[in-house]
């Protein structure tokens, strides 16, 4: 059996798979990761913006968060901040790799959830609510500081999500 592949003759333990998947996220640089309550997302998100609208056989939504800027980054001029201020891309890179890891290791279709806008509804409407995924995965809570989520230990984070047909 190749490294990082399951034995298809033995039953899959969802708890072991979940632990390995969340461990992958942390190893790759996420500060927090969790599995969101898919039923709650489907109930809360508006039609056309639910995970099953993009991936009809989705069974799990994995959410991960990476740290925001350092305190020092907030003190530099804007032109300097444009080069090193955002860690958002790191979250997307981890999620992209995670989708491939889940497919390779668990033979379950997976997709990196795009944070992009809905091309039919315009620039103020996201295709999916990455914040909703993070909140329902327990890695962020709504803040009085604005339309953001905060983690109790890490504060402001950037989030990304992966949809998979693997039931966790």
Language-model features, listed with the residues they occupy:
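Non-catalytic, usually N-terminal nucleic-acid engagement modules in DNA/RNA processing proteins
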Residues: 1-84, 88
